[in-house]
Each structure stands twice: as C-alpha cells, then as structure tokens.
Amino acid sequence: MSTKTITVVPGDHVGTEICDEAIKVLKAIEKVSPVKFEFKHHLIGGAAIDATGVPLPDETLEAAKSSDAVLLGAVGGPKWGTGAVRPEQGLLKIRKELNLYANLRPCNFVSDSLLELSPLKSEIVKGTNFTVVRELVGGIYFGERQEQEESSDGQSAWDTEKYSVEEVTRITRMAAFMALQHNPPLPIWSLDKANVLALSRLWRKTVDHVMSTEFPQLKVQHQLIDSAAMILVKSPSQLNGVIITSNMFGDIISDEASVIPGSLGLLPSASLASLPDTNSAFGLYEPCHGSAPDLPANKVNPVATILSVAMMLRLSLDCLKEAEALEKAVGQVLDAGIRTADLRGSSSTKEVGDAVAAAVEKILAEGK
C-alpha cells in the first residue's frame, strides 16, 4: 500500500469549498483502492497575507517541495486590491520556486450533453478536443520591468519578454510527449508572432529544430497567435491536438478557449516540473476559474477542481485506473443532471461532490 502526500492550498473565497470536494472524492477512492492519501493544509494568496503578511509563506513552499503534488483552490479578490503585496504574487512565486514550467489546460466536453451550454453553436464546437501547453515560468510575466512611478518623468512604464533556446526546447518536449500519448500521435500547433517579434522567431526556429531532430514522426504546424484566436471562435476543432505557446500568449488563448465548453467550472489544469514519463511528475493542480468572491456559499461548481484531481492521479500519482474512473464518474453525474447553476442546474457544491464521490467509488468497486 502506497501513501501519496498532497499539499492542499485552498487560497481565497471559494478555494476552500472546491478543495473540500476534491478531498472528499480522493477519500472515496481510498476506500476501494490500494493507494492512500495524506493531506497537508497550508496558506497561499490573500489568506496568507491576512495571516502572515506575505502571499506565499516559507512553510507553504517547503511543504509543497516535500509532497508528491499540490492541490490549489483559487487566489485573489477585491479585498486585497492591486497594492504592493497581492495574492497573485503567491501563485507566480510558487510556480517559479517549484519550476512548474509547463501548464496543461485541456479544452473538451466531458459529456456531449454539455454542448448546448457553449456560447458557440453546437455544430461548431462538437468534437473540440485540444490541450494548451503553455510555458509558465518565462516570458514577459517574469521579465524585467519598470513601473510608471519608477520612471524619471513618471510618464512611462515597460515590461520585457525574453526566451532562451533551453526554455523553448523543454516546453516543446512536453508538447511532444503529450502528443505521443495517443495512437496515432496528435498533431502539434505552435502559436507565436514570428512576423513581428524576435523572440517568436527564436521560438519557431527552436520548435522546428527539436521536432525535426527528436520527434520526426510528429507533425507540427506554426500559426500566428492572432490567426489562432480567430480559428478558435470560427472552428475550434481545427486546432485539435496539442497547442504549444509562450506564457502570455498561452494565458490569453487558454482563457479564450475556456469559454467554449460553456463554463469555467468545467476546466482543469496542471502545472508540471518535468515530463510525466513515469506518471510521477511533480505538479500543481488547480481549476481554471478564479476565487469568485461574489458567489454565495455552496454554489460554486467543483467539477474543474475534481477533474484537476483526475489529472493529478494520472500525471503525478501514477494512479491511471483511478484517474479514468474519476473522469467517467464526472461524466455520469453531469449526464444525470446533477449540476450547479452555471450549468443550468440546481445542485449545490456539496451535492455534486457527493454524487461524484459515490460514482467513482462504485466504478472502482465494480472494476475489482
């Protein structure tokens, strides 16, 4: 019997509720699986600022480093504003300190019964299935910058974006690895702005070199980021496969993609520090949605967090059977109409969590 250690950092507002449901599901899996989970709870974001004065306490970071994976709820809220110390700084710092260089965001439909919820026509989005692989610890978000008040005349501000061949190489290898998990391998789309930006030209050249020398069996196509943004609205399935792009472009394009399934409450994400080639890469898992400070208690959709746990089971905890069962359980629950208000349902957060926990326990028990 193996024990997997998970550092839980709920963060702010709905973060605690969604993490509670994720833990509920993992405890249900424990009942019918040889794997056991140990949970270590720590602070991040606004909750950490209130308690310690900093958005990422040292003890949180050390706990994360000594665990098999990290489960994050959500950070931020108007209470903490945009001052010098902000909740989001904790998220950026933990990504950097843990070297979580690859962010994976799937965009698909857990169930075809959700197609009608998309803001796009069902016939346009049906069959959409891609994963955005976003470089997460480089680029403009981590480049040198100058605030307006720091300039000599108080009339300018700037940020810099920089990528090295090494940084582009490792994110390309991650995209290739994800593509090779399928038979036949998935196509790869590399998004850049090579017609304007020098770093995009380095990006494109490096991607081509890595793909041609290390993964000649894979198909890679380059697409300008603005063109890809249009395709995503007009015909999203055209980008099916694996999308690889830089930090800022990935942030924007994955947020655009997040509205396709109809609710941010459906979309999981993983941030990895290495290739999951042994299904045991260290990673941080979180829903794509924010902290929803205006949402009443017990109303948030926990599905994105629960599906993030499924990714954790597959990529970090080497629990492939449990991951598949959990994804199947989520589909069954949604098909049964047990949904929160964002999916035109009337169920509460806890009711959805209870239903998924019961479903995954039953699926695993029947599979013994």
Swiss-Prot record:
GO cellular component, one term: cytosol
Organism of this sequence: Kodamaea ohmeri
Binding-site list for NAD(+): 77-88, 290-301
Family: Belongs to the isocitrate and isopropylmalate dehydrogenases family.
Lineage: Eukaryota, Fungi, Dikarya, Ascomycota, Saccharomycotina
Protein name: 3-isopropylmalate dehydrogenase
EC number(s) given by UniProt: 1.1.1.85
Positions of substrate binding: 95, 105, 134, 226
Superkingdom as given in the UniProt entry: Eukaryota
Protein role: Catalyzes the oxidation of 3-carboxy-2-hydroxy-4-methylpentanoate (3-isopropylmalate) to 3-carboxy-4-methyl-2-oxopentanoate. The product decarboxylates to 4-methyl-2 oxopentanoate.
Location of the protein in the cell: Cytoplasm
GO MF annotation terms: 3-isopropylmalate dehydrogenase activity; magnesium ion binding; NAD binding
Reaction catalyzed: (2R,3S)-3-isopropylmalate + NAD(+) = 4-methyl-2-oxopentanoate + CO2 + NADH
Quaternary organization: Homodimer.
NCBIfam families: leuB
Keyword Oxidoreductase: yes
Key words, A-Z: Amino-acid biosynthesis, Branched-chain amino acid biosynthesis, Cytoplasm, Leucine biosynthesis, Magnesium, Manganese, Metal-binding, NAD, Oxidoreductase
Top enzyme category: oxidoreductase
Record: residues binding Mg(2+): 226, 251, 255
Annotated signal peptide: none
Pathway membership: Amino-acid biosynthesis; L-leucine biosynthesis; L-leucine from 3-methyl-2-oxobutanoate: step 3/4
Principal location listed in the UniProt entry: cytoplasm
Cofactor names: Mg(2+); Mn(2+)
